[in-house]
Amino acid sequence: VEMACPGKVSCLGDKAITVLSENNPLTGTKGEIRMGDGFNVEEEIEKVLEQVGKTTFDVALYASGSWKKPQPLAVMVATLAVMQVRDVVWLSALAMACRLLMDTFAEKYFLQPVLQPSYELFKNAGSNMDGTVTSFDNIYYKTNSWASPLSIRGGYPMHSTSNMGSQIYQDNPVANCLDLSSLDLANR
């Protein structure tokens, strides 16, 4: 990113605008935004969407661990010096598992379920339980949106197969990956 946009702290916004503007709703082509570590996902994407306007494009946003800058050799040696063998094995296994989740994240999980009309089959959510709250249920479960539709931190929706039509939020596998840069291994 820095090589493509010299002199800028972040050019993710410029790249995202380019990707979003290349989407064509008539032909069904989709764009993809790849980003690396160190960016505030929600703030950057919100800036982009404010400039180009809210769209209904299905934009897959996921973190790619291969974009992270390599650590200097001195930092790596100092880190390994204070770690025990079991720590290295455990962290390596965790990093591999998290990398696998990040690489397959966009393929497995819907980020914008409102773009999937087939999931909105239950028009009378809650009517079988209590008729007095049907209107509330329909409004709440059908229109309650996330803080940011492109957020990867809040959890991804899993749609219930019951006649309630409610959304069950589960933990996001990418958000659960440990940020190894936050570990203070030198002061254990």
From Swiss-Prot:
Its main location: secreted. Its EC number is 1.11.1.7. Keywords: Glycoprotein, Hydrogen peroxide, Oxidoreductase, Peroxidase, Secreted. It catalyses: 2 a phenolic donor + H2O2 = 2 a phenolic radical donor + 2 H2O. One of its GO terms (molecular function) is lactoperoxidase activity. Partially N-glycosylated. Belongs to the peroxidase family. This is Peroxidase B.
